[in-house]
């Protein structure tokens, strides 16, 4: 065995010939002999072209460039890399051929070049699909937009539970949010039997994380569920019984994370609901499914924001959209004698022209949600309407003063009677010409956090208020969660019940209640197609909407076939209807007067 020649920068290249160099390479590669004479590919592991034997005119003797120039023209054959896999063989050939600045030429002896070997190698790779994973769809758009905008994308995942988050995620930076989700994943994995631990050796949590994370809810831990992601909500339900475990509107989701290197099989998102308040929900997504799930959630957020930009609707005030979840969102409040908004800023003066001139300006005007104070205030069971992000860019009736703004005839709300509509002296109107520039800057601005909702606030602050849309004007921007009209079968079934009063106002219904346990079901006068359960508990009247925007009759715990099924179930079993921490017991039905 010949000793391998070492390269020395002080060595004169004229001492060592090219044959010695190729001989040392052949000994280290496969033991075959290399010569400039005619040779077959099977006998020589390296084929040397004629250009490789020529000396580059620019490279002086003994230079490193001269050596690299010769080695770069060496072509690999399959015999020298027999022990490597197909993928490693391809990478090695690409690296060696890629280092050459000039194209490789065929050997002058007529031997076949290595280029025709590429199809054989690719065919071998096709025959061995286990060498490389199958290609995945791009992260930006993993599914068709119509599917996410419509019924949604469904995944079968494992629900591990949730942990209460005691602080608003909006008040924390991106790094802290990520630490919270990682800590929540670790705690749930340790508490759920059979769950794969996210971290084998986990450091004890810091005091800050311990103060942010609260109690855990493991009621449905370890259950296989169907996760449906759409622009409307994230719906978690059992595949067999279709029992709803959680249904979080996109506006109630403040942060989502998943597919990190150390938590590759887990997705965590923070959302608000009336059962768990603000909580971090953990999903186990095996076989690389976490990347697809988190990509679909991000796509739903992006499409939802684009939908809002294309079809902006009435925008509630910021302090209305940021009300606390602690308020009982499923219950109605009493009528206010005075308007809740009263401009009492001492240093502000009304604009010239007085109150009437301000209202009669031709500029577009959208009445505030509190303008309808005193009318019926309706909430959806199992839906959270008091969160950070209101239903700003979907045509859903947001009930704060409980009047459906899309059921009001067009033109009647442009000029309100004197003394009813509030006027503001500190408003600022942005010209319509400035709106496209604001939208383009918001889209082009870099966002480190994919689920950071700050662009929504910026768009809301810069969005000019448009006129109130009627039903005829809102056909082009139909909401996927708009209330459905009741069918004839439901109305016929309700007419047979003695506790159904028909169409009745809130005030009239409260007048029929005398003691705790009295209840009735009525058809709302301000919200067409809505049915309200009115009952008395602890001497106070409560009003609950029985049908959600999708037309499902449900409470937060169960889905029912009809309104009669819901009422009779709670009446016969004496089970209270729980909503936002309070209870409503159905004991004595208020019968309809004939």
Curated annotation (Swiss-Prot):
Q: Which residues form the SH2 domain?
A: 499-590
Transmembrane ranges, per UniProt, are: none
Identify the CDD domains for this entry: PTB_Shc (cd01209), SH2_SHC (cd09925)
Q: Where is this region: CH1?
A: 335-498
Q: Which residues carry this modification: Phosphoserine?
A: 402
Q: Where is this region: Disordered?
A: 98-147, 351-373, 386-405
Entry GO terms, CC: cytosol; plasma membrane
What Gene Ontology terms describe what this protein does at the molecular function level?
phosphotyrosine residue binding; receptor tyrosine kinase binding
For bias kind Low complexity, which ranges apply?
101-124
What is known about its processing and modification?
Tyrosine phosphorylated.
Q: Tell me, which GO biological process terms does this entry list?
A: cell surface receptor protein tyrosine kinase signaling pathway; central nervous system development; epidermal growth factor receptor signaling pathway; intracellular signal transduction
As for what it does, the entry says: Signaling adapter that couples activated growth factor receptors to signaling pathway in neurons. Involved in the signal transduction pathways of neurotrophin-activated Trk receptors in cortical neurons.
Complex and partners: Interacts with the Trk receptors in a phosphotyrosine-dependent manner. Once activated, binds to GRB2. Interacts with activated EGF receptors.
Q: Any idea what this protein is called?
A: SHC-transforming protein 3
Q: Which organism is it from?
A: Homo sapiens
Q: What is the lineage of its organism?
A: Eukaryota, Metazoa, Chordata, Craniata, Vertebrata
């Amino acid at each position: 065995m010949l000793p391998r020649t070492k390269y020395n920068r002080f060595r004169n290249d004229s001492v060592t010939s090219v044959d010695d160099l190729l001989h040392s390479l052949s000994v280290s590669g496969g033991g075959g002999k290399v010569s400039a004479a005619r040779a077959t590919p099977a006998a020589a592991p390296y084929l040397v072209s004629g250009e490789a034997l020529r000396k580059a005119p620019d490279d002086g003797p003994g230079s490193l460039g001269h050596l690299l120039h010769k080695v770069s023209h060496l072509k690999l054959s399959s015999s020298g890399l027999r022990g490597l896999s197909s993928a490693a063989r391809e990478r090695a050939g690409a690296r060696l051929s890629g280092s050459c600045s000039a194209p490789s030429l065929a050997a002058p002896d007529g031997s076949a070049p290595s280029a025709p070997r590429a199809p054989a190698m690719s065919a071998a790779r096709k025959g061995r699909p286990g060498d490389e994973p199958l290609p995945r769809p791009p992260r930006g758009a993993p599914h068709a937009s119509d599917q996410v905008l419509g019924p949604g994308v469904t995944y079968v995942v494992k629900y591990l539970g949730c942990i209460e988050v005691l602080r608003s995620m909006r008040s924390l930076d991106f790094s802290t949010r990520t630490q919270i989700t990682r800590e929540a994943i670790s705690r749930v994995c340790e508490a759920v039997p059979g769950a794969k631990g996210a971290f084998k050796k986990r450091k004890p949590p810091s005091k800050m994380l311990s103060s942010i994370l609260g109690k855990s809810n493991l009621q449905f831990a370890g259950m296989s569920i169907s996760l449906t992601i759409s622009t409307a909500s994230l719906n978690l339900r059992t595949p067999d019984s279709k029992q709803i475990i959680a249904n979080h509107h996109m506006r109630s989701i403040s942060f989502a994370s998943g597919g990190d290197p150390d938590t590759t099989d887990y997705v965590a998102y923070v959302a608000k609901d009336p059962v768990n308040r603000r909580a971090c929900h953990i999903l186990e997504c095996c076989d690389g499914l976490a990347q697809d799930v988190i990509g679909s959630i991000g796509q739903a957020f992006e499409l939802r924001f684009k939908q809002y930009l294309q079809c902006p609707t009435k925008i509630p005030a910021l302090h209305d959209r940021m009300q606390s979840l602690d308020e009982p969102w499923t219950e109605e409040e009493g009528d206010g004698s005075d308007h809740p908004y009263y401009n009492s800023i001492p240093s502000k003066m009304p604009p010239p022209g007085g109150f009437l001139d301000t209202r009669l300006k031709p500029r577009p005007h959208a009445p505030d949600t509190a303008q309808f104070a005193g009318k019926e205030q309706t909430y959806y069971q199992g839906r959270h309407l008091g969160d950070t992000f209101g239903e700003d860019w979907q045509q859903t009736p947001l009930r704060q003063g409980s009047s459906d703004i899309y059921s009001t005839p067009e033109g009647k709300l442009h000029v309100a009677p004197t003394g009813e509509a509030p006027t503001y002296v500190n408003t600022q109107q942005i010209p319509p010409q400035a709106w496209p520039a604001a939208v383009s800057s918001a889209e082009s601005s870099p966002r480190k956090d994919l689920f950071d909702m700050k662009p929504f606030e910026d768009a809301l602050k810069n969005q000019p208020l448009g006129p109130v849309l009627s039903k005829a004007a809102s056909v082009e921007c139909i909401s996927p969660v708009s209330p459905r009209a009741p069918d004839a079968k439901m109305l016929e079934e309700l007419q047979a019940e003695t506790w159904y009063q028909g169409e009745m106002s809130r005030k009239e219904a409260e007048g029929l209640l005398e003691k705790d346990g009295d209840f009735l079901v009525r058809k709302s006068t301000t919200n067409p197609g809505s049915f309200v359960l009115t009952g008395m508990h602890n001497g106070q009247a409560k009003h609950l909407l029985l049908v959600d925007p999708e037309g499902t009759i449900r409470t937060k715990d169960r889905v029912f076939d009809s309104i009669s099924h819901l009422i009779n179930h709670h009446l016969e079993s004496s089970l209270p209807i729980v909503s936002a921490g309070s209870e409503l017991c159905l004991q004595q039905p208020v019968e309809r007067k004939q």
